[in-house]
Regions:
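Short, flexible micro-motifs
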Residues: 23, 42, 100
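Short, mixed-charge, low-aromatic patches
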Residues: 11-20, 43-46, 61-65, 87
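Hydrophobic pocket/interface hotspot
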Residues: 10-13, 24-26, 33, 55, ...
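Short, low-complexity N-terminal intrinsically disordered segments enriched in polar/charged residues
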Residues: 1-31, 129-132
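A solvent-exposed, acidic/Ser-Thr-rich amphipathic alpha-helical stretch
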Residues: 30-80
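Residues at secondary-structure transition points
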Residues: 1-4, 46-53, 99
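A beta-strand edge to alpha-helix "cap/lid" segment located at domain peripheries
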Residues: 2, 60-132
Length: 132
């Protein structure tokens, strides 16, 4: 796929967060895909390396916190070859009325029109604070 097509695919992927679309997110990932989030897993349950299969429960748990989903605002997006890098921020309201606004740098690797690797850098302590 071209860099332009890869960037479009990543924008589409991020748009599914707004709808709480775990199924759609997983469908866009390759069967052997992995997703890594910075942080210490014993302090932040979403941290560490997860397989696509493990991401089902992670995404279900994430979307269960919110009234609708998370709006992902893309601030910058750069692509080269099979890699797309995104700087973004999220906006959402939890079911308990807390505002969730986090910052991200996410590195995507794509293969054959599917996302095969996600490396997400975010503020895990903000997530812990809001989701408790």
């Amino acid at each position: 796929m071209s860099v332009t097509a890869n960037k479009h695919l990543v924008r589409c992927f991020l748009s599914h967060f707004e709808k709480g679309g775990a199924n759609e997110l997983l469908e866009m990932m390759g069967d052997d895909a992995t997703w890594w989030v910075n942080g210490k897993p014993h302090l932040f349950a979403f941290a560490g390396l997860k397989t696509k299969a493990e991401m089902r429960s992670v995404l279900d748990e994430l979307f269960a916190f919110f009234n609708v989903g998370l709006q992902m605002e893309v601030r910058s997006l750069i692509g080269e070859g099979d890699i797309v890098a995104v700087e973004a921020c999220s906006h959402g309201v939890t079911k308990h009325g807390k505002r969730y606004e986090n910052e991200y740098h996410i590195l995507f690797r794509l293969r054959d029109g599917k996302i095969v690797d996600v490396r997400e850098y975010t503020d895990p302590m903000h997530a812990v604070e809001v989701m408790q």
